Amino acid sequence: MKKLLTCIALGFATTSYAVTPLWMRDVQISPDGTEIAFCYKGDIYKVPAKGGTATQLTTQASYECTPIWSPDGKQIAFASDRNGNFDLFVMPSNGGTAQCLTTHSASEIPSAFTPDGKYVLFSASIQDPAQSALFPTSAMTELYKVPIGGGRTEQVLGTPAEMVCFDKSGKTFLYQDRKGFEDEWRKHHTSSVTRDIWMYDTQTGKHTNLTDHAGEDRNAVFTPDGQTVYFLSERNGGSFNVYSFPLNTPQSITAVTKFKTHPVRFLSTSSDNTLCYTYDGEIYTQRPGVNPQKVRIDLIRDDQEQISDLNSSKGATSATVSPDGKQIALTLRGEVFVTSADYNTTKQITNTPAAETGVCFSPDNRTLAYASERGGNWQLYLAKIARKEEANFPNATIIEEEVLLPSKTVERNYPQFSPDGKELAFIEDRMRLMVVNLETKKVRQVTDGSTWYSTAGGFDYSWSPDGKWFTLRFIGNKHDPYSDIGLVSAQGGEITNLTNSGYTSTSPQWVLDGNAILFTTERYGMRAHASWGSLNDAMLVFMNQDAYDKFRLSKEDYELQKELEKEQKEVAGDKTNDKKKEDKADEKKDEKPKDIVVELKGIQDRILRLTPNSSEMGSAVISKNGETLYYFSAFEDKYDLWKMDLRKKETKLLHKMNTGWANMEMDKEGKNLFLLGSNSMQKMDMGSEKLTPIHYQANLKMDLAAEREYMFDHVYKQEQKRFYNCLLYTSDAADD
C-alpha cells in the first residue's frame, strides 16, 4: 500500500513540475544547429534542436535574458540585472560560473560574438560621439565591444546598431537601425521611423542600406555562405514573417514563411542553414524548402508562484482624510488601507489582485466608498465598520464589504458621499456624473457626458456643503482639452460655465461655507500651447454678491463688520436664554447646513485672482475662517508650502518642504491641515502652523502572478474601450 501511495505521489509531482513552456523569448540556435538557447521567466535555458528536456543554465533570482552563442558553441553571453542594472555576462554553454564583463550603470544588451570569438558586441547608451546629432536619450544606443575575458570596452559605432550578425570573415556585419522612440513590440507600424536592415563594412566604415520599406524590417541574419540574408518583416500587409534576399540584389525579396495572425520573432540561423524562430510563443526550426517544425520542449521547473510580502511606509498613490481628522484612507499598490492620523496603526481593507481607487469617507467616518476593477469592470464598493463599539477602521476587527449597483458592463468610479451621507455621487462610464440614493438604490443623472471627452477615467467634482449643487471641471464649447469650472444642480440640469477663460481651469472646491469656489487656472500665467509649461494661479468665484462684498472689505472694515455681527449674535442670544432648551432632534436640525445662496446673474464679475504671481502650483486650500490661503508651489526645485493672508495680501514661505506633489485637505472643523503625498504625509495644526509627520505601515501579501494576469486584462480592456474603434481599424483587436 505504501509503495502504491509513493508511486501516486511521484506521478503527481511529475505532472506538477513538468511543464510545456509558452512565450519563450530571445531564442537563438547554436552555430552547429544542435541546440537552442532561450529565455523563460527570467532564466536562460537550452534544449536540443530536435526537442526534448530543457536544461536550466541560470538560477539567480535576478532576470537573465538575450543569450548569444560563441562561434565554437562553447560559451553563451547574456544580460543580467543581478548587480542592479543589466550587465554583460559570459558562461560555459553547459552551465557553470558566469563572469561579468561590464560594470557601467547603463543597460548593456549583447548582440553577437565576433567571428574569432574574442569579443562580444553589445548595445548600450554610454557616450555619444562628440559629432553626434542624435537626441541624447538612452533609447538611442551605441554599439560597443568587450573582450570575453573582460577588459576595456571599445565603441564600434556611435549610432544605434541592434541585432548584429557577422559574416564568416568578420569584415562586414548586418544590423537593424533605430530612428525613433516607437515601441519595438508595436504591430503593423508604418512610418518613417520603422527599422531597416543595414550592412556595415568594418574595413571602410561604409554603411549600406539593404531595405527601404515604410514598415518594419529587422533581425537580419546571414546564410552560412554569406550570400543570402534572412530577416523579419511585416511586408504585404501581414504580421512578421521570415523573408530573404540575395545580398547582391536586396530588392529581390522572397517570402520564406507565411504565418498568419501572430508575428514571427527572434530569428537566428546555424552553420547548416537551419532557421530558428518563435511563433505564438513557441519555438520552430525550418530547413530550406521544408515546412516549419515545432520544437517540443519539456521543462522541469517549480512553477508555483510564491506569495510575496510588501512592508511599506511610503508610496501611496492617493490619500484622503476622514471628516473628524482622525483617520487617513490611502491606496497603495492598488489596495485600500486606513491608518491613524496620530499613530502608525494601519488596517488593510482590500486584498485583491485588481486595482482599487478613488477611496473616500462617509460623513460619520465609519464607511468607505471606492471603486475596484474586480471581475473585469470598474464597480463601486462600500466597506463598513461592523461593530458599533469600534470607533475607527485602523482598530476595527470586522469590516463588511458590499458591492454597490453591480454590473458587468457599466463602469462606475470616483465616488463621493453627499454631506448628509445619504447619497453617493460617482462618474459613470468615465464621462457622466451620477448620484445614487444609498437607501433606495435609485440612480439619477446629473450630467449627460457631453461635456467631457477624455476616456482616462474621470474629472474633478465636489458636492456643495448643502448637498444641492456640484462644482465640476468640464469642457465648454467642445474646447477639449481646455477645461472650465462649472456649476450644476445636484438634481441635474444645465451646467453653468463659471470661468469661460479659453484656458485650462481645474481643481474646483467649495470654500467660505459654500459661498465661493476655489480653483486653479493658467489664464494669467504661461499657457500649455505646446502641451506643457503651464503656470497657474489660485482664483475664487463667489456664489452671491454679499459674500463677494464681504471678502473685499479692507482689514479695518472687516474687523468692524465682525464686531457688529458679534453684537447682533449676543443680542439674539439674550432673547433665547429665557426659552427652554431645545431637544436633541432640534439640535440636529440646527446643525443642518444652511442653503447656499446662488446668484447666477453677474457671477462672472465676481471672480478674483488670489495669488500675486503665477507659478507651478500644486494643491491649495483656504482656512475655515476664510482668512488664509495655503498652497503648494515650486519655484526652485520641488514643492514648498506657501501662505497668503487674504486681507493683508501678504505672501510668505511657510515651510520649505522640497517635496513632490501632495494633496491638501482639512478636517471638517478646520483645525488641522493634512499634507498627503506619496513619499510623506504630515499634519499641520492650523493654530500653531506646526508640522507633525504621519506614519503608516502597510503590510500586505502579494500574489504576483495574479497581479500580472490582472494587469494584462486591464491593458487589454483599456485598449478596447479607449483606443480601438472598429470603424477606424480594419484588423481585429482581439486577434492583435
Please place each PLM-identified region on the residue numbering.
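A short helix->beta-strand "capping" segment at the edge of beta-propeller domains
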Residues: 19-24, 54, 301-313, 397-402, ...
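Conserved small/polar residues in nucleotide/adenosyl-binding loops
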Residues: 729-735
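Beta-strand-rich domains and repeat architectures in extracellular enzymes and scaffolds
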Residues: 19-45, 316-334, 611-627
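A flexible loop/linker signature enriched in serine peptidases of the S9 family
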Residues: 19-21, 39-45, 58-64, 77-89, ...
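Conserved blade-ending motifs and adjacent loop-strand segments that build the rim/top face
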Residues: 254-266, 496-507, 618, 655-664
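Long hydrophobic segments that form regular secondary structure
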Residues: 606, 612-649
